[in-house]
A protein has these predicted regions:
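Active-site-adjacent loops and short helices of periplasmic peptidoglycan-processing enzymes
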Residues: 1-106, 113-119
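Domain-terminus/edge residues, biased toward the C-terminal soluble/receptor-binding domains
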Residues: 85-86, 99-102, 106-277
């Protein structure tokens, strides 16, 4: 988002520096294979970052947008504070491990929901594959690809994955079905064998898929109080003709509740004192 908000023309090009190369290559992080001196557009670098999770692309963008990587990281921290994050601190642009680089699922939800308001962020983060140097780079979110039967979820869209030895496997993914939209955030999930499988499973994708299946099957947007419905009575002090008055809903009240919830289970709390006009 720092890049999208500060670069108006994503066709502008910038070069890979030696410092950006050294910060990514050889670290064990995923890279796109950008070479020192290679010139790429911001548009390409954003696709490599969001689709391929390319650490080297992140480093190039950080230097270009921030002037220095350190200043870009400051811009990142300023931006997340602006969207209400209180438990996040970044020390680098790519998410490589650092004891002082941290966040929470709650803060990541704030970051993602704010970012999803930007149409360009949606475009880059939900692209399922990107052509680069003659190769088709698939989105690192395996929930988007039918070939991965264990992980694939037809309603999934984007957004971002990340993994390090310390943080293990993480995914933020959106899913839309029948007019409902949910965001799943799974962090520090292991890679392990499940049941009798002979291979290791990235549990972040399995868990996100399970969360979506539960939400779509178990929750429903429901009108619990209809407009003009009488929901109770309140006392009236010094009433001319009555000591009470009916309390009527001015509008429908719609909330997401468990499927099959008995309306009698809904508790309506009424203020002790209500001003009648």
């Amino acid at each position: 988002m720092v890049t999208l908000e500060n670069v108006k023309d994503v066709s502008v090009k910038t070069k890979m520096s030696q410092a950006a190369y050294d910060a990514s290559v050889g670290t064990g992080a995923q890279v796109a294979g950008i070479t020192v001196g290679e010139e790429l557009s911001v548009d390409t670098l954003l696709y490599l970052t969001m689709v391929h999770s390319a650490c080297d692309a992140c480093e190039v963008l950080a230097e270009f947008v921030g002037g220095t990587k350190e200043n870009f990281v400051k811009m990142m921290n300023d931006w997340v504070k602006k969207v209400g994050c209180n438990d996040t601190n970044f020390t680098n642009p790519s998410g490589l491990h650092d004891d002082n680089h941290y966040t929470t699922a709650r803060d990541m939800s704030k970051i993602t929901l704010a970012a999803l308001k930007n149409a360009n962020f949606v475009k880059y983060s939900t692209t399922t594959e990107y052509e680069y140097k003659g190769y088709t780079l698939p989105h690192t979110n395996l929930m988007l690809h039918p070939g991965y039967v264990t992980y694939y979820y037809e309603y999934a869209q984007g957004i971002k994955t990340g993994s390090t030895e310390q943080a293990e496997y993480n995914v933020i993914v959106k899913a839309s079905k029948d007019g409902y939209n949910y965001l799943a955030i799974v962090m520090k999930s292991p890679q392990q064998k499940i049941k009798n499988q002979s291979y290791l499973t990235k549990c972040s994708f399995v868990d996100a898929k399970s969360l979506f299946e539960w939400a779509f099957d178990s929750l429903k947007y429901t009108t619990i109080v209809a407009k003009d419905e009488v929901i109770g009575e309140v006392s009236v002090e010094n009433g001319k003709d009555a000591d009470t008055v009916a309390l009527v809903a001015a509008n429908d009240t719609n909330v997401i509740v468990p499927v099959g919830l008995d309306k009698s289970a809904v508790i309506i709390e009424i203020q002790e004192k209500i001003l009648c006009v």
